[in-house]
Amino acid sequence: MPVFLLCTFLMIILYPIGIDLYLVAVPKIADALQASEAQIHTAFSIYLFGMAATVLLGGMIADRYGRRWVVLGGALIFVLASLVAGHAEGITQFYLGRFWQGIGAGALYIMTFTVLRDVLSQERLAMALSMINGVICVIPVLAPVLGYLILSHFDWRGIFVAMALVAAVSGLVNLLLLKETRPARQPGSGAAQPFALLRSPRFMLLSLLTSASVTSILVYVSVSPLILMKEFGFTTEQYSIVMMVMAGVSMSTSFLTPLLLRWLGKQKVLAVSHLSYLLAVCSLLGSWQTGGDIHLLLPGFALVCVGFSCGFGVAMGEALDGCQHNVAFASAVLCIMQISLSGLYIWLLGQLGFTPSEMLICALLLALLSYLAVKGLLPWLALREARSQG
């Protein structure tokens, strides 16, 4: 298990590094490319579009030809794309590099869940995903610091060289240590019909559950600077301190989740996760109704972090359960649903004029409704399937 944890950790870190490492250099990139900061920030959406546009194809290739091809290919693409973006002379070339970075990061993102699902039992999978999530929580805190250190010695292009080096290390370690994990295909396993998953009510319900949880955490990340700095008047330094504390809450919860799983079991941990969301809603509503009470707001933020950190790995493991011969395709579908739902939600509520606090509260309510749908409908679906087979 330690070898697979190392390999998959090096796979999944490319996704957040591709987002967080270059943010401190946005003004310098804008000046160098003679672009507006808004154009540079558009590269974030292009990066996510690159991920979403290719993960289905990557999943099908992995299910048909093996996981190593996708892992090594994704790492190589990320290396080359980072160098393209780092040597850009104009915004178009920068966009091109960011798009292909997204392709490489997306391939390695879905392979993280795929490889772990291949080699671990359902119980150990939830624990492993929680541990990986705990390490990943540190990256948004450390990446700006690392970016600042790079900028203190090199220009902004050095950041993309650093991204390329991280991807090269990831590819090399996986080349040397990662063995092929794709299960042998068996007649009648359904491996040739990956789209059959989309007709599975159980899989789609659990996909909605994971997507609603991802939407909640991404909305929290998106609106927290607006709430704290614009509404409460926090300085950049004060905001950074709060985010470091929240990252610590997320990391601590993620590392404690394996113990909770042994003690309570998966279903109770999932219930604790959504109880945290419910308490977060109450805390945020209290802050909102009192005209902005920071002593209610910050515990609400912490509860959002707790809910996501202890529940996401369990929900992902449940969604991938039973997808043994199409697990890479299933991981790709989950990735697309999570990106699409969160992006659509943030865009739609922004267009409708919702305030940042309202957006976060509604996202948490969506997660709670998804959980209630899963708890109410899955037993009924299992009973219906048992009757049809009997």
Positions of PLM-derived features:
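Helix-breaking motifs and short loop linkers at transmembrane-helix boundaries and internal kinks
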Residues: Q34, G66, H87-Q93, G104, ...
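Juxtamembrane intracellular "pre-TM" segments in multi-pass secondary transporters
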Residues: K179-L206
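Helix-to-loop junctions at the C-terminal end of transmembrane segments
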Residues: V55-G66, T253-Q267
